[in-house]
């Protein structure tokens, strides 16, 4: 019903974006979602709400680039809590000092930590999902292809943090 009314007022993509926000309203932080979309995109794209941010998140997106057409809810950060673990309210953290490249649907469940160092590139293709409490640390470049799912509490690093001096 809501989607039909919105589709009359707005084009289909914008109506779907707003409908997603209302569908998951218990888990979406509306202020962060609206602020982030209008900060990073022109108004016509921001109204599609390509980035949806859940409650209990700490996000610094830095540079973000879409390598695909912008659609509603392409990036879902912490909007799908896991009730089995900690009532699904573990803090999701994204600290991006580099560049994030998005190639399609990208979902992070609650508790995920993504840290991207200055000058580093973290790129994901279409249909990528990170499970609860997973970690990604990118110092140079991490590239993830299509149809990738990472289970709970997994880690991806492109460094071992052991530095060698001459």
Predicted regions and their residues:
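Acidic/polar low-complexity surface segments
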Residues: 79-80, 161-166
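Domain-scale signature associated with acetyltransferase and cell-envelope carbohydrate enzymes
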Residues: 1-157
């Amino acid at each position: 019903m809501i989607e039909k009314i919105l589709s009359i007022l707005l084009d289909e993509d914008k109506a779907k974006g707003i409908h997603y926000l209302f569908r998951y309203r218990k888990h979406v932080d509306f202020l962060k979602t609206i602020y982030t979309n209008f900060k990073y995109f022109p108004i016509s794209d921001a109204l599609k709400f390509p980035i949806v941010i859940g409650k209990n998140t700490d996000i610094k997106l830095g540079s973000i680039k879409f390598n695909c057409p912008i659609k509603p809810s392409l990036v879902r950060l912490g909007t799908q809590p896991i009730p089995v673990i900690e009532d699904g309210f573990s803090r999701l953290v994204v600290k991006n000092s580099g560049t994030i490249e998005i190639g399609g649907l990208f979902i992070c469940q609650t508790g995920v930590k993504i840290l991207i160092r200055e000058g580093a590139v973290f790129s994901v293709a279409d249909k990528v999902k990170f499970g609860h409490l997973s970690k990604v640390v990118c110092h140079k470049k991490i590239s993830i292809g299509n149809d990738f799912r990472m289970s709970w509490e997994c880690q991806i690093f492109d460094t071992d943090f052991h530095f060698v001096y001459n």
